[in-house]
Amino acid sequence: SFSPCHMSRDLRVALFKQRHPPPLHHEDKEYEDEHDELGDLPSFGAGSTSPARAPASFTPLSSDDCFATALEIDILCTPNTHATIRAYYTPPRGESNTVVVCHHGAGFGALSYALMARDVSALSQGELGILAYDCRGHGRSTFPSHIVKDMSLASLTSDMIAVLQTLFPASDARPSIILLGHSMGGAVAVETAHALERQNDIRVTGVVMIDIVEETSLELLPSMSRIVRQRPEGFVSVASAIQWHVKTRTI
């Protein structure tokens, strides 16, 4: 099976080198539910109003060519309770059988990985599959009302394991997994890696954490109510929502 250790140096550099993605092509057809261009908006703002740089356009980009398919995965979130996970997946091609599984940060969604997914697939020439999903309380995943507010690390980890075991049932064809998490998702990725190691179930070949800032997050907790109150109640368009989030440096 494919291992990151076997990739050429040039490919490793290309995968992790910072670069500006090219503009996406806009498609006329709808992609699943109303394009799924952005998922849910982030749940907090940073409060600053001066942008680092003004982009030429705030027009939303299409995610049409970023993943091969959109999925709805039915999981057991408790022994007697089902939930539906919205996921986006591009399977690995050829002899490779490794999938990068992405968990987003708090207030974000699976499609925050859309451009990265497209580029990783292209740069690895399809050797790496990529899966991203909306965790509970985010995006288009649906959980029962008495379950969805439980955002504990244990519950998020249990959800991630359930997604993996459901989508990749035990067999010789089960892929090896690279777990990738941004912010809150980084903690989930690490905890999931430990849990899978104890279970000796799914093979994890790597863990990637992006922007892990627990100390800063804890320091901001007393100010979070003020930050949330500064958010607009709504936006007249997706473009205006993007503009506000960029100018306040939320994204």
Give the predicted meaning of each segment.
Residues 181-185, 189:
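Gly/Ala-rich beta-loop-alpha elbow adjacent to hydrolase catalytic centers
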